[in-house]
Amino acid sequence: MKLVFLGPPGSGKGTIAKILSNELNYYHISTGDLFRTNIENDTPLGKEIKQIVENGQLVPDSITIKVVEDKINTIDNRDNFILDGFPRNINQAIELDRLLENIKIINFLINEKLLVKRLSGRRICQSCCKIFNIYTLPTKEKEICDFCQGILYQRKDDTKESLKIRLQEYNLQTKPLINFYSNSNRLNNIDASKNINEVQKNLMEIISKIEKKLV
C-alpha cells in the first residue's frame, strides 16, 4: 500500500512512519531525512536546502519534487511505502499523482498549542542523535544524553520564533491538501494528540479498513 502521511511538524507522523517501516516492512521515505542527507553530503542541493531551513522556510517545490522522485525511482517495491513530509501543497500532490497511482492519505490532527510545546521542547544529542523533550521526555541530567552522555542541542528551526513561521507556511500551503484528497475519497484522519501507542493502534485499524476495501 502506498501511504502519504500529512500533518504539521511535531504531529508525530515521522515517528509512526519509522515504527511501521520496522513492523510492517514499509519503506519509509522522509523528505526531512532526504534533505539532511543532502546537507550532510554538502551537495549543491544540500547547500541550498540548508540555507532555506535555517531561515525557517519550506524548501521550494522544484527541489522537493526532484529529491523525492529520485528516491522513489531507487525503490524495488514501489507498492509498499510511506511518504512522510510530501506532498506539502497542491502542486506537489499533482506531481505525485503523475508518478504513482492508488495513494492513500493519513492526516495527523493535532492542535497548535501542543505542537509548539512538543517542538520547542525538543532536544537532540550531538553524538548519538537520540531525541528528548524538556517537557515530555526530559533527561536525567539537564542537557546531557541519557544514553551516551553527549551534549544536547536545539535545532534552529525548533525555536518558538521559527515554529511560528513554519506553522504559518504549513497552514497556508498544506491545509488545502485536505480538501484535495477529501474530494477523491483518499483522506483518513487520525487523532495525533494521543500517546504514541494509541496513535499506532488507531492507524493499524485504519490500514486494515483500507486493505479490506481494496480486496
UniProtKB/Swiss-Prot annotation:
Any Pfam family matching the protein: ADK
Keyword terms of this UniProt record: ATP-binding, Cytoplasm, Kinase, Metal-binding, Nucleotide biosynthesis, Nucleotide-binding, Transferase, Zinc
E.C. code: 2.7.4.3
Biological or metabolic pathway of the protein: Purine metabolism; AMP biosynthesis via salvage pathway; AMP from ADP: step 1/1
Reactions the enzyme catalyzes: AMP + ATP = 2 ADP
Stretch list, region NMP: 30-59
Domain of life of the source: Bacteria
NCBIfam families with a match to the protein in the record: adk, PRK00279.1-3, PRK14526.1
UniProt cross-references to InterPro entries, sorted A to Z: Adenyl_kin_sub, Adenylat/UMP-CMP_kin, Adenylat_kinase_CS, Adenylate_kinase_lid-dom, P-loop_NTPase
GO molecular function, one term: adenylate kinase activity
GO CC terms of this entry: cytoplasm
Protein name: Adenylate kinase
Residues where ATP binds: G10, S11, G12, K13, G14, T15, R122, I131, F132, K194
Annotated organism of origin: Borrelia recurrentis (strain A1)
Binding site for AMP: T31, R36, Q57, L58, V59, G85, F86, P87, R88, Q92, R155, R166
Record gene name: adk
Entry comment, domain topic: Consists of three domains, a large central CORE domain and two small peripheral domains, NMPbind and LID, which undergo movements during catalysis. The LID domain closes over the site of phosphoryl transfer upon ATP binding. Assembling and dissambling the active center during each catalytic cycle provides an effective means to prevent ATP hydrolysis. Some bacteria have evolved a zinc-coordinating structure that stabilizes the LID domain.
Known role: Catalyzes the reversible transfer of the terminal phosphate group between ATP and AMP. Plays an important role in cellular energy homeostasis and in adenine nucleotide metabolism.
Assembly behavior: Monomer.
Annotated localization: Cytoplasm
Family as reported in the entry's similarity comment: Belongs to the adenylate kinase family.
Region spans: LID: 121-158
Positions that bind Zn(2+): C125, C128, C145, C148
Species lineage: Bacteria, Pseudomonadati, Spirochaetota, Spirochaetia, Spirochaetales
GO biological process: AMP salvage
Membrane-spanning residues: none
